[in-house]
């Protein structure tokens, strides 16, 4: 059939550095005729990197920011435009496409942030480059969407400032 195979030991493969190698095979038949074939193989084990920019300007999503949704963005290294970044936050997954300047961005809807609730959590991002190597990064953030409690008590005993009270100091409490 003309097919053949050889097993290269793992120790020999792992000893190869990052480079392009030529694999050459030769055969000689019983009549002394020989043939040689070569094929280039690239060794690329470098993992891409992913960074996540500061979220909500201080890594704390407050009530107003939670209500507006948030953009989570960052950069990659060792990847290329068109590669996909996968972001997880609060058990949900979002995807972004790496842009020409190696940046990426996902929009997290307000409903998703509000469903997570308050607390500390980690944003995780990963990217797989064109040769199948995967790198990841993370950033710790806090969701603090509790609105502060505030009340104003009844003013002037009846919420009406009369002519007598109008000429006096007025104490407002809450």
Describe each region flagged by the PLM.
Residues 76-83:
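Short proline/glycine-enriched turn/loop motifs at strand-loop junctions of beta-rich domains
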Residues 1, 89-97:
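Surface-exposed loop/edge segments in extracytoplasmic proteins
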Residues 48-65, 148-165:
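Short, solvent-exposed loop/edge segments of extracellular or virion-exposed proteins
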Residues 25, 123-125:
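Hydrophobic/tyrosine-rich beta-strand signature of extracellular beta-sandwich/beta-rich modules
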Residues 29, 33-53, 129, 137-153:
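Flexible, low-complexity linkers/stalks enriched in Thr/Pro that connect modular domains
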Residues 2-6, 102-106:
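Short strand-edge motifs at loop-to-beta-strand transitions and within beta-strands
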Residues 68-72, 168-172:
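Structural beta-strand segments of beta-rich domains
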Residues 10-20, 110-120:
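Surface-exposed, short loops/turns at beta-strand junctions within beta-sandwich domains
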């Amino acid at each position: 059939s003309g097919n053949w195979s050889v097993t290269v030991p793992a120790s020999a493969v792992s000893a190869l550095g990052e480079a392009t190698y030529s694999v050459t095979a030769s055969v000689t038949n019983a009549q002394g005729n020989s043939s040689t074939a070569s094929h280039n193989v690239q060794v690329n084990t470098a993992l891409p990197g992913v960074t996540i920019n500061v979220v909500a300007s201080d890594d704390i999503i407050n009530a107003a920011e939670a209500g507006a949704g948030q953009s989570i963005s960052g950069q990659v290294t060792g990847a290329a435009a068109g590669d996909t970044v996968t972001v997880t936050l609060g058990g949900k997954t979002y995807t972004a496409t790496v842009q020409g300047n190696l940046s990426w961005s996902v929009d997290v809807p307000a409903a998703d942030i509000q469903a997570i609730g308050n607390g500390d959590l980690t944003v995780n991002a990963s990217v797989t480059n064109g040769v199948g190597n995967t790198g990841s990064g993370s950033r710790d953030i806090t969701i603090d969407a509790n609105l502060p409690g505030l009340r104003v008590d009844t003013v002037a005993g009846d919420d009406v400032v009369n002519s007598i009270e109008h000429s006096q100091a007025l104490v407002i409490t809450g």
